[in-house]
Structure formats: structure tokens, C-alpha cells
Amino acid sequence: MNEREFKRLLKVRARLKRKKPRFLRQEWWRYPKFKNDPKWRRPKGIDSKMRLKLKGKPRSPSIGWSSPRLVRGLHPSGYEEVLIHNVKELERLDPRRQAARIAHTVGKKKRIEILKRAEELGIKVLNPRL
């Protein structure tokens, strides 16, 4: 896959994501225990209007909402995210297709070392804050 096609697929994914609704479980607004944890659960009731995909009911996830396969799961910049805990893990990355995300358990001193080494290797760090 060439660079132009890759960028085109990233744009297609961004356009699809803008239109994608939030998929929430059936009647999530009705019970407080669902409001605090609004994640998808498939409707399974025999009389469920949402399962029958009736007009006016919330949308259900289906394969048509997914991103193009070649760019699925990538960072919006087009890089594959890799979680980094130390400098040794950073050196295994491919700077052309992978970007580093420093783990939240890493302290300030080691974070500075990782950022310096990433700059030397030409690796993009997705969360460079100090």
C-alpha cells in the first residue's frame, strides 16, 4: 500500500467516525446503574424494539460502521501506538510506522531520558508532556 492510498484511508476513517453514533445499551437513560456505565450490550429480549431495528430506536453496531481494515486501530496521525516503559523498549520501534506512548507509571527522570533518546532516534512521542 502506497503513501497516498494510506492517507486517503485515514481521511475516509475520519469522515466515518464523525458520523458514527455513540452505541449505548438499550434504555440506558432509564436506570441510574446504566447511566454511570454507558457501554454497549446487545439487546436480547424477544419483544425488544431495538433488536428488531425499528425506526426511532437507537442504532446498533454493525459491520458497516467499521473503519477500513488497513487503518483500523491506528492513531489519527497514522502511526501504530506502542506503550513504552523504558529506553530499551523505545529502541525496538520502527520510526516510520510506530509512535511511542509513555506509560503513566513512568516517573519524570526516566521520562526525560526516553524523550531525549526518542529525539535521537527520530521517533514520535504521542504524550511528551513533563
UniProtKB/Swiss-Prot annotation:
Keywords: Ribonucleoprotein, Ribosomal protein. One of its GO terms (molecular function) is structural constituent of ribosome. SUPFAM superfamilies: Ribosomal protein L32e. GO terms for cellular component: cytosolic large ribosomal subunit. Pfam families: Ribosomal_L32e. GO terms for biological process: translation. InterPro entries: Ribosomal_eL32, Ribosomal_eL32_arc, Ribosomal_eL32_CS, Ribosomal_eL32_sf. The keyword Ribosomal protein applies. PROSITE patterns: RIBOSOMAL_L32E. Belongs to the eukaryotic ribosomal protein eL32 family. This is Large ribosomal subunit protein eL32.
